[in-house]
Amino acid sequence: MLRHNVPVRRDLDQIAADNGFDFHIIDNEIYWDESRAYRFTLRQIEEQIEKPTAELHQMCLEVVDRAVKDEEILTQLAIPPLYWDVIAESWRARDPSLYGRMDFAWCGNAPVKLLEYNADTPTSLYESAYFQWLWLEDARRSGVIPRDADQYNAIQERLISRFSELYSREPFYFCCCQDTDEDRSTVLYLQDCAEQAGQESRFIYIEELGLGVGGVLTDLDDNVIQRAFKLYPLEWMMRDDNGPLLRKRREQWVEPLWKSILSNKGLMPLLWRFFPGHPNLLASWFEGEKSQIAAGESYVRKPIYSREGGNVTIFDGQNNVVDHADGDYADEPMIYQAFQPLPRFGDSYTLIGSWIVDDEACGMGIREDNTLITKDTSRFVPHYIAG
């Protein structure tokens, strides 16, 4: 894995506008950063990214299978007891899943380490699957990278294939919250993939969803919604006043209820418990197990439910705060994880996001930040394969 500088396309702003990439600049700061690129060999991708991703995902599914049968685990995950049985039912029925993203730290000369699994509402999808590929094609044509360079990126192909498998005559609704440009772009991109797969689709904001007779979900025209993709966290749905309606299982939600086990950072101590010493895992503990942290060991404290680095704190071996990110999740239960520093290239720390669609590893995206904690403002940098 090498990073090097590359020229930015002169018409980047126009290319982004033409392709609906409305958030390549966020708050007047660069988000999509193509002034640099990461180069990987095919062997690095296959052995150090793709293979571990596939293995870790299967391990995660085993955790789900154990968790739905164990009330102690569900309690540790802070999942409300009201939903335990329907989560188990969702798993037994193998309610269909679409995608997820594993976040890795990798220094290039040791196994990747899983930091967390964003299995419910992962973003940076459009950038990884589509806009990054456009960059590759332009970079090859212009000679910025080798003409025969490739990219670890079959994400869009797998998404369209998965939507084909989920085909139904019933409209597939796609929803997110209002006033979130990134979320809206992600959802519209997924909607486009569904339409390429032959699905009839409709977009609606979460705030516009209604309730019909008997608690059925409806759109603005009072049509009953039977299937919906939501870029809206499952734990928020469970805590909502209408959350108990999830128990009726009238709608098919993507992601399904069983994903609440994987979208929870409590997954990390469970993985360590069931697969201790695995080379791609970091030692992790629940709040009641933090005494197991070795004296002098650096560690990270994370809320069970948090996003984009919110309320994550890094401590050194003397319990001094090394780095901290503010957020809205300070009141959530915490987990603790052995500290694995992200590799540093120049002034930036690098995080690899490895994508899974329909249980298959299929691509990646790279984020950079000036701090050790990756946040929603962290830059996205393209990659390619050569050699």
Q: How would you describe each model-predicted region?
A:
Residues 1-387:
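Preference for protein termini
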